[in-house]
């Protein structure tokens, strides 16, 4: 209880939200359970966040911003290509290990399309198009909710795209036809790998070295 009281109301709510969303996913999470764990009033939660979606977004956005700040240091454009690649993969694995369940929930919110539609990136517009594969067109509210989560994931993948593009431009990496797709596969594949591993003796530097080897040997001239 003492630790709870040392935190601000917002911090207690976000910490409780992380516990509940990580354990139950988005759909089954309830504000009532979050309120109980945070040891605060319902009115306080609604005052700061309004609804479950905005609370989840605030939690995810905060973690995303902190992650991107770390990547700015470890993947600084002034660093050599291999250092940037290694730095990205190391920070990514550390981040996923810490937030693996929460980021799986994020992916479901951003990508899962039970209503039969998804986003497709449009290079000319530099924006997302809606691809309705079956069923009816989504409402503007549905598009807005899913888009903000999709853009969070894209912001993280974009860092790897930039690094690999540098490798291509400098002649270290051969041209890649669909660079964003390759970067996304590396990113999402890492989340799946971390989510499914039961190893207690993970050596991040060794794992990163293996990933760098696979990436470079797959695309090296």
Located regions from the model:
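Basic, helix-initiating cap at the start of DNA-binding domains
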Residues: 1-24, 28-40, 54
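Short hydrophobic/aromatic patch on the recognition helix
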Residues: 39-49
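Alpha-helical DNA-contacting segments of helix-turn-helix folds
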Residues: 57-63, 70
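Hydrophobic alpha-helical connector segments
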Residues: 58, 73-101, 183-186
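Helix-loop "lid/cap" segments that line or gate small-molecule binding pockets
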Residues: 90-97, 107-115, 131-136, 214-219
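C-terminal peripheral helix-coil segments that are non-catalytic and often amphipathic
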Residues: 94, 158-173, 182-221
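Short, hydrophobic secondary-structure boundary micro-motifs
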Residues: 104-106, 173-176
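Amphipathic alpha-helical packing segments from all-alpha helical-bundle domains
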Residues: 116-170, 180-181
């Amino acid at each position: 209880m003492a630790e709870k009281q040392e935190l601000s109301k917002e911090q207690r709510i976000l910490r409780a939200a992380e516990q509940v969303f990580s354990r139950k996913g988005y759909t089954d999470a309830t504000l009532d359970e979050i309120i109980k764990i945070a040891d605060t009033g319902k009115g306080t939660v609604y005052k700061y966040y309004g609804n479950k979606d905005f609370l989840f977004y605030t939690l995810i956005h905060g973690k995303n911003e902190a992650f991107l700040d770390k990547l700015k240091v470890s993947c600084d454009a002034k660093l050599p290509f291999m250092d940037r690649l290694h730095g990205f993969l190391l920070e990514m694995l550390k981040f996923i290990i810490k937030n693996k369940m929460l980021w799986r929930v994020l992916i479901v919110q951003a990508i899962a399309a039970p209503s039969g539609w998804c986003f497709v990136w449009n290079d000319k517009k530099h924006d997302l198009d809606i691809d309705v594969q079956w069923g009816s067109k989504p409402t503007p509210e549905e598009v807005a909710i899913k888009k903000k989560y999709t853009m969070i994931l894209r912001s993280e993948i974009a860092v790897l795209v930039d690094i690999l593009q540098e490798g291509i431009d400098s002649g270290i990496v051969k041209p890649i036809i669909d660079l964003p797709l390759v970067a996304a596969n590396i990113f999402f594949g890492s989340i799946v790998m971390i989510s499914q591993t039961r190893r207690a003796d993970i050596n991040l530097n060794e794992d990163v070295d293996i990933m760098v080897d696979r990436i470079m040997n797959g695309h090296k001239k």
